[in-house]
């Protein structure tokens, strides 16, 4: 069963958190859920070059809080926070309420090459540039290994290299224990649009096992060849406070 179900949905409340954190009545729930979907689609479409890994949405009374995990926070923040104001206006326009209070927090992804969505996005970009899929997968695996992940699985489906018959190819490096609920599995999907049709991309990244309230176990000497990474940036929007 662990190989069929969505790894994120299976681990909600165990090693994964909900992407939308709010409660609503049965009457307003569908509208708010569709609103979240529109916000995410708007952000990924307009700021695709920012390498946005995840969008977390929370609601408190009339306030909307949006947290963006990105590989390039400077693209979102802009000069003196001008990008944040533009993003806030875009979200207000998307939800159809210019007076809605929107608070935006931008968090930098610590290990870009160890993030499943960013890896899937990289693979999609390479495939759209007509790079051979085997070479693309090999390069993605090497990048993930340098980031120190414990295991990785990549699957690509469609008309690979322009073949007449669609097929599925996959590769796995290290451990990817999909049946272990305490395993921290980062899962993402992406679609690559090519001249021969669309290619489906799935990426599973095993980051360690979570025991109780402990952080995921990181392999010893995960990245000894790389110098110490700089502290991840975080921009917290306080423009709506007091």
Swiss-Prot record:
Q: Which GO terms describe its molecular function?
A: mRNA binding; rRNA binding; structural constituent of ribosome
Question: Which InterPro entries does the record match to this protein?
Answer: KH_dom, KH_dom-like_a/b, KH_dom_type_2, KH_sf_prok-type, Ribosomal_S3_C_sf, Ribosomal_uS3_bac-typ, Ribosomal_uS3_C, Ribosomal_uS3_CS
Is Metal-binding among this UniProt entry's keywords?
A: no
| Biological processes, Gene Ontology terms | translation
Where does the record place the KH type-2 domain? 39-110
Q: Where is this region: Disordered?
A: 221-242
Q: Which SMART domains match?
A: KH (SM00322)
- Compositional bias annotation for Basic and acidic residues: 233-242
Domain of life, per the record? Bacteria
Name of a matching Pfam family: KH_2
UniProt keyword terms in alphabetical order: Ribonucleoprotein, Ribosomal protein, RNA-binding, rRNA-binding
Q: What GO cellular-component annotations does this UniProt entry give?
A: cytosolic small ribosomal subunit
State the similarity comment: Belongs to the universal ribosomal protein uS3 family.
Q: What does this protein do?
A: Binds the lower part of the 30S subunit head. Binds mRNA in the 70S ribosome, positioning it for translation.
PANTHER family (alphabetical): 30S/40S RIBOSOMAL PROTEIN S3 (PTHR11760), SMALL RIBOSOMAL SUBUNIT PROTEIN US3C (PTHR11760:SF19)
Tell me, how does this one assemble? Part of the 30S ribosomal subunit. Forms a tight complex with proteins S10 and S14.
Annotated protein name in UniProt: Small ribosomal subunit protein uS3
